[in-house]
Amino acid sequence: MWKAVKAQMSEQEQYQESPENNDDEGFDFTHVNSVARIALYDNLLSAPRVTEIQPAPTGEFIESLATNVYQQSQAAGGTIPYTVIREVSENFIHARFQEATVSILDHGCTIRFADQGPGIACKDRAQLPGFTSAIEPMKSYIRGVGSGLPIVKEYLDFTHGTISIEDNLGTGSVVTISANGSNPQLPKELEIDHV
């Protein structure tokens, strides 16, 4: 059966999905040893301001990254909630935090999360509840039940924002989330009348 599946997959997908290329079991998930970078763009005509998130225990690293991205995007005028940013930030664990880079664009309304990990082979299924590649050592830091990106997608769908998942250059993934302008709107049926 594995041969039939392999025949239908591209070379990159074969590399990403092949059990012999999955070295997560030997990876130390307790501490992030790499630096993450946050690039805040005022516009695309000038270089971004770059903030580095230094190596730290995994829980602290994820919290620091998500908090810094949230604060910088809000200060730039964005409205993407912390929970949405946190869910995507946690996904870097699947890439073993390899070259984690977050770009804040469009006055904080677009945030792009890029890595050079193994990538996401099934981009559509990654946005559906219950599909997960989390293994036991990751579950000390994330729920690991396949709910992260579906939560993000649901929020962005309700507020007329967008999420896209693409292959990065060479290897890895790029997840881009965008709010609807600077003031996303809830559907009328979810609004509360203020009297």
Predicted regions and their residues:
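Conserved beta-strand-loop-beta-strand hairpin that lines the nucleotide-binding pocket
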Residues: 1-46, 84-85, 89-195
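Donor/substrate-binding cores of folate-linked one-carbon enzymes
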Residues: 50
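Conserved short strand/loop->alpha-helix "switch" segment adjacent to the catalytic nucleotide/phosphoryl-transfer site
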Residues: 53-89
